[in-house]
Amino acid sequence: MVILVMGIEGTGKTTVGKLLAERLHWKFADADDFHSAANKEKMKQGIALTDADRAPWLAAIREQIWRWIAAGENGVITCSALKQSYRDELLSPPPGMEGSADKIKLVYLHGTYELIAQRLHQRQGHFAGEALLASQFATLEEPRDAISIDVSETPEQIVDEIMHRLNLT
């Protein structure tokens, strides 16, 4: 199984994803690590990425997800996956793996604009900052088929809830 933890910046995807992977003894990958240097620089400057900017990034994340599934490995991967079209691409199985999409579980972390803005204001050393928050909320297409988790609780409580809702406890 692969758990895709999604949401806008500042929802705690990396913190929650790492903690979840540690608790389950699963592999972990952060989509931020798949961004090109050019994409990171754009975001650092507060410039929202275009779909063309995101295309190779999404392809690399998709490849990682399906590599784990093909190998029979369990993993947690974080990705903003703001648009339904991005999620459709990530969940689309490569040739020969049709029927395997049920091995991917989508977890949507969400919070109020105010809560996320406060978190971003406190966050240090990340290339994406508060300047992108409004554009991320505007771009977000809330997922239809995801486990929806409010991020006003602690990361530990959020992980407990995810594990409970996925019957992993």
Where are each of the predicted segments found?
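The conserved Walker
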Residues: 9
